Amino acid sequence: MTNIRKTHPLMKIVNDAFVDLPTPSNISSWWNFGSLLGLCLITQILTGLFLAMHYTPDTTTAFSSVAHICRDVNYGWVIRYLHANGASMFFICLYAHMGRGLYYGSYAFRETWNIGVILLFTVMATAFMGYVLPWGQMSFWGATVITNLLSAIPYIGTTLVEWIWGGFSVDKATLTRFFAFHFILPFIILALAMVHLIFLHETGSNNPTGIPSNMDKIPFHPYYTTKDILGALLLILTLLMLTLFVPDLLGDPDNYTPANPLSTPTHIKPEWYFLFAYAILRSIPNKLGGVLALLLSILILALIPMLHTSKQRSMMFRPFSQFLFWVLIADLLTLTWIGGQPVEHPYVIVGQFASILYFLLILVLMPVTSLIENKLMKW
């Protein structure tokens, strides 16, 4: 008799995705981040649900409701900090997952990659709106500055910003709608993640060599379920250490001051995971130009499959491309650092140089290097 997991309509779907899935035998720990992102998402949805039970999306009570969660709700402080630091862990996993895709040429699966880019945008939007909810100084001014960028759009800009705000400034209407969107978006992310997986399972996983591995596949369970559990335990350990020992390490002290429209903080900056994009935005002294550069810095990911000029899929056997890849990582870390610094010399010029290098690497240097490597293969 056939096992029920292979015949039952619902269990069959789970079985084909997590049990009997043929998986390359040589995928490394860099392939763990997909499952870790799933774990992060579930954690965020659960902690967020419990926070929403005690939070009030109103300008007069939002800040004190968060204080109430931390002081009066049973283990409310744990839930709140798990949620805040969970977002940081989410982005660490997200960037590692994307870096893996870039390095090993996983972007050759066009549909999977494009859904991934859409997922990135959705997660970024969710994180931004979540940061506004505690209604501290950085929440308010972050929301004001970032939404105001849309006013750079010719002709409809100002109208669009006021439409998003629901008034003439960031106020009660803005907070309420941000809370509504922050609640619904994770479920949209969940649905998109399923589509992401469906497309991935059409082609099967890539592997470090970039060479098709159909003749050498092993079942996902027990090999990769075990490997994923190890990754999950390390993720949980890191998250718990952050939450229980240094809960405010990645946050901004300004957000412990209630929002005040009459007092602007000295340095307005987003959470650490947006700093690289914020640095690119600030490095262009023109509002519309900055907004376009900001958008392009993320949208450029959608162009990656078209910019692939190498005859090899993975960078595993391409030392020059590997070097440029790590230069790109160093450049992004530099941009992240610059984004957190004040707008003054020498940070401005370093930021401008790093921004130019970012686009130059992706659009010119890496494709040209790949062509040179193709020529070298014939020698």
From Swiss-Prot:
A ubiquinone binds at H201. One of its GO terms (biological process) is mitochondrial electron transport, ubiquinol to cytochrome c. Heme b b562 binds at H83, H182. One of its GO terms (cellular component) is respiratory chain complex III. Its cofactor is heme b. Coiled coil: none annotated. Pfam families: Cytochrom_B_C, Cytochrome_B. It is a multi-pass membrane protein. Binds 2 heme b groups non-covalently. It is found in: Mitochondrion inner membrane. Its main location: mitochondrion. The chain crosses the membrane at residues 33-53, 77-98, 113-133, 178-198, 226-246, 288-308, 320-340, 347-367. Heme b b566 binds at H97, H196. InterPro entries: Cyt_b/b6_C, Cyt_b/b6_C_sf, Cyt_b/b6_N, Cytb/b6-like_sf, Cytochrome_b, Cytochrome_b_C_euk/bac, Cytochrome_b_N_euk/bac, Di-haem_cyt_TM. GO terms for molecular function: metal ion binding; ubiquinol-cytochrome-c reductase activity. Keywords: Electron transport, Heme, Iron, Membrane, Metal-binding, Mitochondrion, Mitochondrion inner membrane, Respiratory chain, Transmembrane, Transmembrane helix, Transport, Ubiquinone. Belongs to the cytochrome b family. Component of the ubiquinol-cytochrome c reductase complex (complex III or cytochrome b-c1 complex) that is part of the mitochondrial respiratory chain. The b-c1 complex mediates electron transfer from ubiquinol to cytochrome c. Contributes to the generation of a proton gradient across the mitochondrial membrane that is then used for ATP synthesis. Heme 1 (or BL or b562) is low-potential and absorbs at about 562 nm, and heme 2 (or BH or b566) is high-potential and absorbs at about 566 nm. The cytochrome bc1 complex contains 11 subunits: 3 respiratory subunits (MT-CYB, CYC1 and UQCRFS1), 2 core proteins (UQCRC1 and UQCRC2) and 6 low-molecular weight proteins (UQCRH/QCR6, UQCRB/QCR7, UQCRQ/QCR8, UQCR10/QCR9, UQCR11/QCR10 and a cleavage product of UQCRFS1). This cytochrome bc1 complex then forms a dimer. This is Cytochrome b. It comes from Balaenoptera edeni.
